[in-house]
Amino acid sequence: MSEDQGKDYTLESDSELRFEIEQKDAKVLVSLVSGFAELFGTELVKKKQYEFGVGAKVAIFTYQGCVLHVSGKMDVCYISKETPMVQYVNCHAALEQFRMEAEEKDRYGPVAMVVGPMDVGKSTLCRILLNYAVRVGRRPLYADLDVGQGSIAISGSVATILIERPANVEEGFAKTAPLVYHFGHKSPSGNSVLYNAVVSKMAEVTLQSLNSNKRTKSSGIIINTCGWVKGSGYAHLLHAAKAYGACAIFVLDQERLYNELLRDVPKGVHVVLLPKSGGVVERSKELRHEARDQRIKEYFYGNTRAPFYPFSFEVKFQDLRLYKIGAPPLPDSCMPIGMKAEDNKTKVVAVTPTPALIHHVLALSFAESVEDDVIGTNVAGFCCVTEVDMERQAVMLLSPQPRPLPPNALLLWSELQFMDNHT
């Protein structure tokens, strides 16, 4: 059968079709011919065609059996009956039990964290649990603490969104009105003190917001985390669990982490060890870098289905209020009386524009002055420095919004860089 005509795949109950696309410009079309199937918790509509492009790693699961029609060039494609989906749906059922109790007693719904090393399917499990919750009428919050590969905002930030409808099969959840906090590094190790401060602030604001809507209050929060699970990374997980008051922690594919958490979290917290899916693929450093770049590119330019058209404009150095969070470390003996070396980690420091600023992504803070709580203030969006002209004392910014910058705009430096070679 030719690649253009495609092929029908018959899946038995509790099995899934997995495929990967690695070749650029390749696209794969999938449609559900009969039966019932879902992609990471989102039900497929019968006879509707779904399109997947380069980088897609897809697992279409069926509880009752189905026939799928697939056409296009795939690097890997196979059916597997070895899937952890039944365990994942059991986790949803347990969370749903907590939600029903919370609804009856007007309490907070379950706060569940998904933890594990890199490349075990943490964000996928979050997506499955959120989709299942929405499908039974819940409105949970999704908090993403993974600053390396964020699924809500661009890397270098932590973010929360309200989930009101299932994720789009091809594009994921709608990113409407996210609450985003600037961190500015690709790993919590970039500034551990700042990372904990930002996570604490987002947890505080998010938990307060649950009170404004009864349905969301009982629906609870699903939290995605970084893949750094040893040493300081483990300490960050404990910090997040405490800040959010997590009642359940789902540990993917690592017994050591599971046992450490059993030992260290309060007695009432349910710690559950889960297998990772056999379809999870390890990503190289290069692939991670590409994924970060792609997220930033999509922030400014959208995608083929919904393209954006960003603006480029000049800002004079004198009009640029640019700051960085975290000053170079000093020994305690050199610090002012009453200050510790770690206080420097959260200090807001002015940045003088130089050619080194080129390609850096900057966050636009809602804070209007450095006297405000800059760390504890969320950001409105991002821009990117595409040019630095020392002669004319000006920078060129790529921005989703036209000129000028808002009055009193306070920009925050990030180590993230984006080469804008979009044509």
UniProtKB/Swiss-Prot annotation:
One annotated GO molecular function: polynucleotide 5'-hydroxyl-kinase activity
Keywords: ATP-binding, mRNA processing, Nucleotide-binding, Nucleus
Main location as per UniProt: nucleus
UniProt keyword annotation of 4Fe-4S present: no
TM ranges: none
Origin: domain of life: Eukaryota
Binding site for ATP: E16, K57, D119, V120, G121, K122, S123, T124
Entry's Gene Ontology cellular component terms: mRNA cleavage factor complex; nucleus; tRNA-intron endonuclease complex
InterPro entries for this protein: Clp1, Clp1/Grc3, Clp1_C, Clp1_C_sf, Clp1_N, Clp1_N_sf, CLP1_P, P-loop_NTPase
Cellular localization per UniProt: Nucleus
Physiological role: Required for endonucleolytic cleavage during polyadenylation-dependent pre-mRNA 3'-end formation.
Name the UniProt record assigns to this protein: Protein CLP1 homolog
Gene name of the record: cbc
